[in-house]
Amino acid sequence: MTITQVKIKKLENFSGSLPEYATEHSAGMDLIAANEQPITIKAAAIQLIPTGIAIALPDSFEAQIRPRSGLAVKHGITVANSPGTIDADYRGEIKVILINLGKEDFIIEKGMRIAQMIIAKYERILWEESSSLMETMRGSGGFGSTGV
């Protein structure tokens, strides 16, 4: 396995520990809330939550912000734009767009684990315009066409 080093900056509102893998085979690292005061996410509402960190990803890498399954199943808290994408050239604070799909208000306290961050490599492409596409068994069938 290749380990890529990524620079991370702790901002003034940072507290706690840097994102880290919970187990040897974890794909994501937990992101910690860095809000000064508790933030209430009302039922069916969205809030932007600071993390207190900024990163400098290498070229051809992105960070994906995804929900934590425990928050989703127990409280209906998820990432509104899942997965959120942090581009390699972004240097600002990483913030998480959380939405409360539950029926009760939910309070985000400083230091709470709010989301997961996955670092992934990607490739850029160049479009080749064509008047036809290669046929496949699936064809243009979508939205349940292969079974429900």
UniProtKB/Swiss-Prot annotation:
Top-level taxonomic group: Bacteria
One Pfam family cited in the UniProt record for this chain: dUTPase
GO molecular function ontology, one term from the record: magnesium ion binding
Protein's job: This enzyme is involved in nucleotide metabolism: it produces dUMP, the immediate precursor of thymidine nucleotides and it decreases the intracellular concentration of dUTP so that uracil cannot be incorporated into DNA.
UniProt pathway: Pyrimidine metabolism; dUMP biosynthesis; dUMP from dCTP (dUTP route): step 2/2
Cofactor: Mg(2+)
EC number per UniProt: 3.6.1.23
Binding site for substrate: R68, S69, G70, N81, T85, I86, D87, K95
Record-linked CDD domains: trimeric_dUTPase (cd07557)
Family, similarity comment: Belongs to the dUTPase family.
Protein name: Deoxyuridine 5'-triphosphate nucleotidohydrolase
One of the GO biological process terms: dUMP biosynthetic process
Gene3D superfamilies, per database record: 2.70.40.10
Keywords, sorted A to Z: Hydrolase, Magnesium, Metal-binding, Nucleotide metabolism
Organism: Rickettsia africae (strain ESF-5)
Family matches, as InterPro entries: dUTPase, dUTPase-like, dUTPase-like_sf, dUTPase_trimeric
